[in-house]
């Protein structure tokens, strides 16, 4: 009889009793009324801001405080006007405006999908084609340049140089800094650029940072804190409902060998779909995340190769009449996943008149096939080439399932042309998730004897050391972000889903930046979840 492996996963610290104890007063009507009054004041503030730099800085603050979505109509008009004043081919005037203005304008516009050329920075370069050394003392300008460089696309060498130049001088500034606030700002940027950060987590940091500044606007601070607390109250109610649902499934008892990461799965879904009004999509995505985790552990840890082959065939046929061919734990999992998938397809058919069951089924089939391929590699002791591994692993990372599920539950009406675009881009979008996961979990998973990851495959291909392989994977991540900047930000293949698609990369970077933030109770992940779901912002009303 084939022995079963055990990953010895630690139990989640987020049990149902704790989750049900979460409570917030910020769902009350008086807070909603106060928020509306503050929004009116901010709208007036936006209307009265005329200077171009002040407008850009205000929009930047609104975005980082997490409240810009309340004023999108106003901010979009401002950005259209600013972009419309572009002087074709004349970049010298940017030097007069300064590096901070030029870089901030570049980043804010590119974030919104405007085709701002990298040549706007040419006026800050000398005849040799290097950035002028006189810029090395411009702290604000360098931070803005560094942040802007992460909006680059493939082949934009000026922005590559901008990243290297600003990074070099910002690291030196941190070493020599006497102003703690300035040092903290630089360190924050260097740890993770703004373009790759999770919106809600950035808001937590930036509210505290901005509030302590001499130029902080108290109305913006109050609205940001109040809005955060109100959305947190929404998250708490969703999390409590999901925890009750998970308890009722009995999956934790029946699949005791697996990771049961309800709160962590909710953090994933929140990172991808943060908007308070998208609760339906967020909760469905969390359920799907829970199923993915269980299926992953069945293939990676517990199932025998013979059982996994039968499970894969039954998922391919999508036929519950074949359940008796499976052991009990697989029957329970498949039936629950099967019913939930069909239920989601029914709700979409009922509400939108479009049948997506074949799409949803196809995603689970593709995922299970890739899981089975990796299981056969493990059982045969086979190390794939890096290319062979990534072709399978970008799917087994579960990005396509997450992206399509997110699209189906946040988009109305569902557009067939957008679905075709998502099919073209899903694997590439999933690659950042896979590579970030491998960087964070590779060491732990190799200790468990899992299939080699990108790092080990590249080491096997080239004979390089682990650190060189890690640097290679980081370069691959950078390349995928550049591709996403072009394919998603600039080309806008989806009317409203582009930010959500980009968010998959952001939450991936967040979860795995300090190791495996999902597989086990992790101090960094715990800190993030407490800030997002438990602790409200201090505010006096």
UniProtKB/Swiss-Prot annotation:
| Cofactor(s) in the UniProt record | Mg(2+); Mn(2+)
Q: How is the cofactor bound?
A: Binds 3 Mg(2+) or Mn(2+) ions per subunit.
**So what does this thing catalyse?**
(2E,6E)-farnesyl diphosphate = alpha-zingiberene + diphosphate
One of the GO BP terms on file: diterpenoid biosynthetic process
Q: Which residues bind Mg(2+) 1?
A: 296, 300
- Give the EC number(s) listed in the UniProt record: 4.2.3.65
| Gene Ontology molecular functions | alpha-zingiberene synthase activity; magnesium ion binding; terpene synthase activity
User: Which of this chain's residues are annotated to bind Mg(2+) 2?
Assistant: 296, 300
Q: Does the keyword Nucleus apply?
A: no
Top EC class of this enzyme: lyase
InterPro entries in the record? Isoprenoid_synthase_dom_sf, Terpene_cyclase-like_1_C, Terpene_cyclase_plant_C1, Terpene_synth_N, Terpene_synth_N_sf, Terpene_synthase-like, Terpene_synthase_metal-bd, Terpenoid_cyclase/PrenylTrfase
- The positions annotated for binding Mg(2+) 3 are 437, 441, 445
Biological or metabolic pathway of the protein: Secondary metabolite biosynthesis; terpenoid biosynthesis
Report motif location: DDXXD motif.
296-300
Q: Which domain of life is it from?
A: Eukaryota
**Protein keywords:** Lyase, Magnesium, Metal-binding
Domain comment quoted from the record = The Asp-Asp-Xaa-Xaa-Asp/Glu (DDXXD/E) motif is important for the catalytic activity, presumably through binding to Mg(2+).
- Entry function: Sesquiterpene synthase that catalyzes the formation of alpha-zingiberene and other sesquiterpenes from trans,trans-farnesyl diphosphate (FPP). May have an additional monoterpene synthase activity.
Its family remark reads: Belongs to the terpene synthase family.
Name the chain's protein.
Answer: Alpha-zingiberene synthase
- Record the organism: Ocimum basilicum
